[in-house]
Amino acid sequence: MPVASPPAGVSAGVLIRSAFAALNEQDVQALRGSWSESIVERFPEVTLHGRDEVAGYFETLFAAVPDFHIEIKALVEQGEEVFVRWRLTGTHSGTPFQGIAPSGRSLASDGVDHLVVRDGMVASNFVVYDQMQFARQIGLLPGDGSAGDRAAKAAFNTRMRLLARLRERRR
């Protein structure tokens, strides 16, 4: 299916606001129309190359979080670069995401995108968000300060002390 290009002459900020609206509509075809063919999208956990990979990522995300919503909290445009601080909410209740079965838990995560627009299309995006917070919210990691969290930290610290002792003995 051909990808429609955004209207000519649209500022980078307007293009990004339009893309965020498409995210909330879960309209992957509209998103494809805002991405360059060779887009590079860097998330903390994966780097995606090209429209097809990025589209696949969002299709999987939308299937995993059917009530996905992302709100722009702040947007700064400087020429071809746009910085967006956002808040994502939803429920991890659909299909598995990145190998993680749906937990039924609510999500509320803040993040920042640094997008570069070239020739009227998103050429790259660097995404930053708190992966530990996300993992705790879906139940992949124990809650901060919980018994499970304290046990995991104690086990890790014990391991580090043992490794330090082994290094000392090898000297």
Predicted regions and their residues:
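C-terminal and inter-domain tail/linker signature
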Residues: 1-171
